[in-house]
UniProtKB/Swiss-Prot annotation:
Disulfide bonds: none annotated. This is Small ribosomal subunit protein eS1. Component of the small ribosomal subunit. The ribosome is a large ribonucleoprotein complex responsible for the synthesis of proteins in the cell. Part of the small subunit (SSU) processome, first precursor of the small eukaryotic ribosomal subunit. During the assembly of the SSU processome in the nucleolus, many ribosome biogenesis factors, an RNA chaperone and ribosomal proteins associate with the nascent pre-rRNA and work in concert to generate RNA folding, modifications, rearrangements and cleavage as well as targeted degradation of pre-ribosomal RNA by the RNA exosome. Residues 233-264 are annotated as: Disordered. The keyword Chloroplast does not apply. Belongs to the eukaryotic ribosomal protein eS1 family. It comes from Xenopus tropicalis. The gene is rps3a. InterPro entries: Ribosomal_eS1, Ribosomal_eS1_CS, Ribosomal_eS1_euk. One of its GO terms (cellular component) is nucleolus. Keywords: Cytoplasm, Nucleus, Ribonucleoprotein, Ribosomal protein. Residues 242-255 have a biased composition (Basic and acidic residues).
Length: 264
């Protein structure tokens, strides 16, 4: 066996040398996430995306990004069992403009409502809004004791359950079909649809804890920047002329344009 040093290791080549550690955050930028004008608190927070490099544009990585936010954070409220999903539809400068993408109840709220000695009634329906959004709404309700009832249980008969389910579907269809997405979201925030169902079903069987527990977005119309700007109210309206011009420029080159302006 030949005695001597291994030339490959002593040169400081592949095996001996350490790789240079590059901080991944040095190539990323922070963008503000803006909620539509239906909500009291418009600034949701920030999101990270890799900077524009060559053909890979930063705004393309942000479009379609979904944020799940508690209604308590959107309305500055203490009731925090409703969660809204907001999807990024356009990027204006350093702002991500979002739109409604769905709603859900928290797991702990759903579990707290399901109890013994009562009937749980569920219904779901697919409805189209006036502006072309196809939504699937899920509703849930629970029977409760009548006034002066001595019996421990409050079970509804199968026929009553069917009547209540029919009523739920009718009210959900009516409330969504006659309104656009903005008005539907305004009804989901205080859950006025659930309260209407509770009132309408009193004559069939008394109900409590009636909620639209989930809303799914099934289909959307073709994206229009003007409509998204309307949803974002004052911010969108004020920046509308500039928004149409700068929106396209920012998408093409995030880090290239400012230095050119300075030199001019």
């Amino acid at each position: 066996m030949a005695v001597g040093k291994n030339k490959r290791l002593t040169k400081g080549g592949k095996k001996g040398a350490k790789k240079k550690i590059v901080d991944p955050f040095s190539k990323k930028d922070w963008y503000d996430v803006k909620a539509p004008a239906m909500f009291n608190i418009r600034n949701l927070g920030k999101t990270l995306v890799t900077r524009t490099q060559g053909t890979k544009i930063a705004s393309d990585g942000l479009k379609g990004r979904v944020f799940e936010v508690s209604l308590a954070d959107l309305q500055n409220d203490e009731v925090a069992f409703r969660k809204f999903k907001l999807i990024t539809e356009d990027v204006q400068g350093k702002n991500c403009l979002t739109n409604f993408h769905g709603m859900d109840l928290t797991r702990d709220k759903m579990c707290s409502m399901v109890k013994k000695w009562q009937t749980m009634i569920e219904a779901h329906v697919d409805v189209k809004t006036t502006d072309g959004y196809l939504l699937r709404l899920f509703c849930v309700g629970f029977t409760k004791k009548r006034n002066n009832q001595i019996r421990k249980t409050s079970y509804a008969q199968h026929q009553q359950v069917r009547q209540i389910r029919k009523k739920m579907m009718e009210i959900m269809t009516r409330e969504v079909q006659t309104n656009d997405l903005k008005e539907v979201v305004n009804k989901l925030i205080p859950d006025s649809i659930g309260k209407d169902i509770e009132k309408a079903c009193q004559s069939i069987y008394p109900l409590h804890d009636v909620y639209v527990r989930k809303v799914k977005m099934l289909k959307k119309p073709k994206f229009e920047l003007g409509k998204l700007m309307e949803l974002h109210g004052e911010g969108g309206g004020a920046g509308k002329p500039a928004g149409d011009e700068t929106g396209a420029k920012v998408e093409r080159a995030d880090g290239y344009e400012p230095p050119v302006q300075e030199s001019v």
